[in-house]
């Protein structure tokens, strides 16, 4: 199952981009025997619309249009569920075992996700009640995807 990290906005060169790339690159060899990967990154430009609702709608439509056909969706959203790394891995495996060709992890723009994206998500995940910069959320999500792959593989990376 192909994995896709789809985000609004571009990560500039720097430490955050390097970390995301490091985890995405690690997913391919670790996930191949499990039928997971490769992991591709899709970056959608931020909308220039004046109203937040219009920005979210434009960004949401662009995100959904960029995803592979038949992809399952896991969206990061403050209204989502807080999952342990093990639960996250189990949810990923369930999507894979359901025969999906791809699983997309969605990070919205500064205004959040459009209802159209939330409605299509099989799962919404929150990283707590605090607000984090989008750059760090991408790093955290890429690491959690890699961690989930290693949990499913029985690799010692995850020791909890």
Swiss-Prot record:
Its EC number is 2.1.1.177. InterPro entries: Alpha/beta_knot_MTases, RlmH-like, tRNA_m1G_MTases_N. One of its GO terms (cellular component) is cytoplasm. It catalyses: pseudouridine(1915) in 23S rRNA + S-adenosyl-L-methionine = N(3)-methylpseudouridine(1915) in 23S rRNA + S-adenosyl-L-homocysteine + H(+). Keywords: Cytoplasm, Methyltransferase, rRNA processing, S-adenosyl-L-methionine, Transferase. CDD domains: RlmH-like (cd18081). Homodimer. This is Ribosomal RNA large subunit methyltransferase H. The gene is rlmH.
């Amino acid at each position: 199952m192909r994995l896709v990290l789809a985000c609004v906005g571009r990560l500039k060169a720097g430490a955050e981009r390097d970390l995301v790339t490091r985890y995405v690159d690690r997913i391919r060899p670790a996930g191949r025997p499990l039928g997971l990967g490769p992991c591709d990154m899709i970056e959608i430009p931020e909308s220039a619309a004046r109203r937040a609702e219009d920005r979210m709608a434009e960004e949401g439509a662009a995100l959904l249009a960029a995803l592979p056909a038949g992809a399952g969706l896991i969206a990061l959203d403050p209204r989502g569920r807080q999952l342990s790394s093990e639960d996250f891995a189990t949810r990923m495996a369930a999507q894979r075992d359901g025969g999906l060709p791809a699983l997309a992890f969605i990070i919205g723009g500064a205004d959040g996700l459009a209802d159209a994206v939330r409605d299509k998500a099989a799962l919404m995940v929150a990283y707590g009640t605090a607000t984090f910069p989008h750059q760090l959320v991408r790093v955290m999500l890429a690491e959690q995807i890699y961690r989930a792959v290693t949990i499913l593989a029985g690799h010692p990376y995850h020791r909890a």
